[in-house]
């Protein structure tokens, strides 16, 4: 049996902008092994979660190598949206970055600048991200064309500025960060939209400025996933590597108890 060739992970941005349905997950465990498993299954992208998990420069390097080896787009949710953090993961071969708590147009412009050479301020490095010099002078335009910038919308302030954020050139996708966004709205002083209303506001801004939407759900068969697809989400993330492990382990435990309880084994 032959297997269809995997898409070039460097085509991720093109596929995202074309609104191709894309499946991804968060990688919480700082190891290349889980990334290899997810990539081998055929996921379109993985997001190595530096913000909420103990990834460091060395483990990120190996995780991004594993993603590329299996034809999966490796993206990093950076812990700190600053030029050094963005430069290091792009040099190590990240296809793009996911920037947390983008709550103003200026922050969005800064992140776009730090992620691009031409018209930006990204420093030139010829490592894995630069294919070790194989493209020569073509590296700069190719990198600018293929680097993906995803802005996470996670704050009430971001909802208030969403039209300006979505209008920033170079912001390729808006991520509906509903966990932190819900906390921010509940903690807000004065009148604030509900989480459902806020999600619809972001969706409307994405349509207005022709930006793809991304989100994470616990399962694709859920009503939540269907609702988000209806709002225009095309880059859908399901759980995380640890979430999948917990699900599988819980199912095995349940099956074990059921089997012995019925005397089948």
Regions found by a protein language model. Name each.
Residues 1-265:
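Expand to "…catalyze enediolate/carbanion chemistry for C-C bond making/breaking, isomerization
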């Amino acid at each position: 049996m032959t297997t269809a060739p995997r898409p070039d992970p460097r085509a991720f941005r093109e596929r995202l902008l074309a609104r191709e349905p894309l499946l991804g997950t968060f990688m919480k465990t700082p190891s290349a092994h889980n990334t290899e498993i997810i990539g081998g299954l055929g996921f379109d992208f993985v997001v190595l979660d530096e913000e909420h998990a103990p990834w460091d420069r060395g483990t990120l390097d190996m995780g991004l190598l594993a993603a590329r080896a299996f034809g999966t787009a490796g993206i990093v949710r950076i812990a700190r949206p600053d030029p050094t953090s963005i430069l290091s993961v792009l040099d190590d071969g990240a296809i793009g970055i996911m920037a947390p708590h983008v709550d103003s147009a200026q922050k969005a412009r800064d992140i776009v600048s730090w992620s691009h050479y031409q018209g930006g301020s990204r420093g030139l490095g010829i490592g894995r991200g630069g294919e070790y010099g194989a493209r020569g002078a073509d590296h700069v335009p190719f990198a600018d064309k293929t680097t993906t910038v995803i802005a996470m919308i996670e704050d009430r302030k971001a909802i208030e500025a969403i039209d300006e954020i979505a209008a920033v050139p170079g912001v390729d996708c808006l991520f509906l960060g509903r966990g932190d966004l819900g906390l921010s709205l509940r903690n807000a002083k004065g009148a604030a939209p509900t989480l459902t209303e806020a999600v619809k506001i972001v969706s409307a801004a994405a349509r207005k400025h022709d930006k793809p939407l991304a989100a994470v759900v616990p399962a694709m068969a859920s009503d939540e996933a269907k609702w988000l697809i209806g709002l225009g989400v095309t880059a859908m993330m399901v759980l995380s590597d640890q979430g999948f492990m917990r699900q599988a382990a819980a199912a095995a435990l349940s099956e074990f108890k059921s089997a012995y309880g019925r005397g089948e084994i």
